[in-house]
Regions:
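Conserved beta-strand termini and adjacent loop/short-helix elements that scaffold enzyme active sites
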Residues: 85-87, 135, 235
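Surface-exposed amphipathic alpha-helices with a cationic face
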Residues: 31, 69-76, 119-133, 220-228
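Active-site substrate-binding loop(s) of clan PA
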Residues: 111-120
Length: 286
């Protein structure tokens, strides 16, 4: 495949509580897998900062940026690129957004960013030159009430195969899932990460390689088709091995964070790397 392969959705053990691989090891693994670069996009929201809220804000920012900085240091002198990003979530929804073009100073100046809904946060991000991509849109989790407990342990492959049958299930928002408890058992689809503020976005992740979630590929493609102004990317959403289960090919390798934003703005995407199929529908392409 021609082009330069970059994974734009990677979590480190240093700065994401759900990350299981140290940043220096991530760099080695991706280099061995044939990638040209990665973006460290650790989870940025209350669920990270609330656990260290006793620290002064500059120290909290240091903790958050540790994964990126460790990866950057590990790649020094190799030609492998490490870009800084965040996976932003506000305190209002369970939607996630990949954001590029920010830096330490922006984080220091905006300690209340997660307290704002996306529309208000996006105004600040865009004013700083940032770029916002909807992460894993139309993510799906099945649930069923079992007495006073909620069962959500369905395997991804089983959810995908069921969705392919076309059977329509009752749907509720992820945030309302506890309302199922105590009701008659019925298989229900929990919705999360769908386009709430499309005018605040610059792109959409049409393929997400995280094997622990199902994703409605029809809906993801529909979002992208309805917004031709969006850039489309594919990424792995790496938390643990195997690595490189998704990636985006660019027609050149962006030199730094600012160049990455320009490449996304100019839609310099030439193809996708698809690690495995966790979609209902195949990804059509850039």
């Amino acid at each position: 495949m021609s082009g330069y392969l970059v994974d734009l959705h990677v979590h480190s053990a240093e700065s994401s509580y759900c990350g299981h691989v140290p940043a220096h090891e991530i760099v080695s693994a991706y280099r061995e897998a044939g990638f040209d670069g990665i973006a460290i996009t650790d989870h940025y929201g209350g669920y990270f900062f609330d656990k260290i809220k006793e620290l002064p804000w500059p120290e909290q920012v240091d903790r958050f940026m540790r994964g990126y900085e460790e990866a950057k240091a590990a790649a020094e002198g190799t030609g492998f690129k490490v870009y800084f990003g965040i996976e932003y979530r506000d305190r209002i929804t369970v939607d996630d957004f990949l954001v590029f073009g920010l830096d330490r100073q922006f984080l220091l100046d905006n300690p209340d960013l997660p307290d704002n809904p996306l529309k208000e946060a996006a105004e600040r991000i865009h004013a700083y030159g940032g770029f916002i991509i909807q992460a894993h849109p139309a993510r799906i989790r099945y649930a069923m009430a079992l007495g006073q407990k909620l069962f959500m342990g369905f395997r991804t492959v089983d959810m995908v195969e069921h969705m392919k049958t076309g059977e329509k299930l009752p749907e509720i928002d992820w945030a309302e899932r506890d309302a199922l408890i105590g009701k008659p058992s019925q298989l229900t689809s929990l919705r999360m990460c769908y386009l709430r503020e499309p005018d605040s976005l610059d792109g959409v992740e049409v393929y997400n390689g995280n094997p622990t979630w199902a994703m409605d590929g029809y809906a993801a493609e529909k979002y992208a088709d309805e917004h031709p102004e969006y850039v489309r990317i594919a990424a792995s959403d790496f938390h643990s091995y195997p690595c490189g289960m998704g990636g985006t090919y660019f027609d050149h390798l962006p030199e730094n964070d600012a160049a990455l934003v320009r490449a996304l703005q100019e839609k310099r995407v030439v193809d996708f790397h698809i690690g495995h199929d966790v979609h209902v529908a195949p990804v059509k392409g850039k």
